[in-house]
């Protein structure tokens, strides 16, 4: 083979290798969210998922070079969906508690919250009434508020079991609060603030729980965990982080 033909062959191979690299499929991850969890994740007026967490993971995906598909998933089935490989991560205001850590892994913490209690504007209910078990309380099933109420009020005989009302999502609990089916509603503080905005409801107090939000990932997906951790690090160091906090009124 002549030197000219050999050079031509090398050039062609280089082009083909470069082309195959350039057209390599971008990795896509399925992100499970709660579709009724403002300001973290909810369905916008255009029918598309949005929120603080949704925009955060979309920014991270672009920054780190992968794609995401946002899939609203029932909260009480979201970890089973993760374990069954139906989704690749949960990025939707999930508390990284010890019970969940037994079955899934978590990213670095990106937010800290407490629990807030809301009542109707005209209500005279107080935190003393709440702590004494005098109020029928609504919250979302499978969430930290439900666990706290069960462990600290129901199991101790302070709150009758029939006064703890569980819902598929917190907006449903807030709706029943508005129409008087429950006396109070309890949930993560920023969720309560976001949900009652513009409604005839008010916050009467908080329960200090110091929960930490993180992204849930299967224990075997260590590469994805590293990818998300690096993405979170870059996001929280970028102007986008403060922009998102301002957009979704994340200052308590």
Where are these regions (language model features)?
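Bacterial N-terminal signal peptides
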Residues: 9-18
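Extended ligand-binding regions for polar small-molecule ligands
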Residues: 54-63, 122-144, 215-252
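Bilobed "Venus flytrap"/periplasmic-binding protein-like clamshell domains
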Residues: 36-38, 49-62, 116-160, 164-169, ...
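Ligand-binding clefts/hinges and TM-proximal coupling segments of bilobed small-molecule sensing domains
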Residues: 67-70, 144-165, 200-206, 233-252
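Acidic, polar ligand-binding/catalytic clefts
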Residues: 62, 67-131, 205-207
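A ligand-binding cleft/hinge motif common to bilobed small-molecule-binding domains
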Residues: 77, 93-102, 150, 175-209
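Extracytoplasmic small-molecule ligand-binding "clamshell" domains
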Residues: 25-93, 166, 240, 247
């Amino acid at each position: 083979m002549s030197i000219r033909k050999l050079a031509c062959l090398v050039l062609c191979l280089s082009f083909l290798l470069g082309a195959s690299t350039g057209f390599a499929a971008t990795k896509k991850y399925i992100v499970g969210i709660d579709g009724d969890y403002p300001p973290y994740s909810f369905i916008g007026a255009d029918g598309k998922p949005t929120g603080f967490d949704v925009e955060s993971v979309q920014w991270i995906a672009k920054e780190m070079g992968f794609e995401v598909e946002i899939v609203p998933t029932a909260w009480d089935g979201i970890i089973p969906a993760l374990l069954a490989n139906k989704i690749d991560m949960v990025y939707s205001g999930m508390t990284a508690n010890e019970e969940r850590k037994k079955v899934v892994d978590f990213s670095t913490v990106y937010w800290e919250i407490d629990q807030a209690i809301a009542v109707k504007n005209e209500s005279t209910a107080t935190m003393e009434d709440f702590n004494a078990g005098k109020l029928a309380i609504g919250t979302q099933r499978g969430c930290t508020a439900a666990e706290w109420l069960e462990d600290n009020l129901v199991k101790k005989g302070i709150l009758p079991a029939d006064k703890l009302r569980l819902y598929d999502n917190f907006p449903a609990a807030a709706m029943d609060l508005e129409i008087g089916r429950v006396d109070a509603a309890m949930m993560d503080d920023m969720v309560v603030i976001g949900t009652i905005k513009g409604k005839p409801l008010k916050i009467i107090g908080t329960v200090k729980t110091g929960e930490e939000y993180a992204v849930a990932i299967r224990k075997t997906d260590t590469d994805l965990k590293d990818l998300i951790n690096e993405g979170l690090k870059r996001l929280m160091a970028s102007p986008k982080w403060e922009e998102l906090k301002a957009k979704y009124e994340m200052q308590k």
